[in-house]
Amino acid sequence: AASDCCSACICDRRAPPYFECTCGDTFDHCPAACNKCVCTRSIPPQCRCTDRTQGRCPLTPCA
């Protein structure tokens, strides 16, 4: 749904050494959600949330 937002981030390791950071565990309502996810340059890469939203979910789904 367009109102979905992200509560977790996942690092996709299918194409090393490049890593795609995507949202996981999306819910229709989440009090503290991720609007964006980024991968760190650590080894192994870690996926973390950026641009946190409070209260309402983002109007567009996290990609």
From Swiss-Prot:
Keywords, in A-Z order: Disulfide bond, Protease inhibitor, Serine protease inhibitor
UniProt site positions, description: Reactive bond for trypsin: 13-14, 41-42
GO terms under cellular component: extracellular region
GO MF terms, alphabetically ordered: serine-type endopeptidase inhibitor activity
InterPro entries for this protein: Bowman-Birk_prot_inh, Prot_inh_BBI
Pfam families listed in its UniProt record: Bowman-Birk_leg
Record's miscellaneous remark: One of the interaction site with trypsin probably also interacts with chymotrypsin.
Family according to the record: Belongs to the Bowman-Birk serine protease inhibitor family.
Protein's UniProt name: Bowman-Birk type proteinase inhibitor B-II
Organism: Arachis hypogaea (Peanut)
High-level lineage: Eukaryota, Viridiplantae, Streptophyta, Embryophyta, Tracheophyta
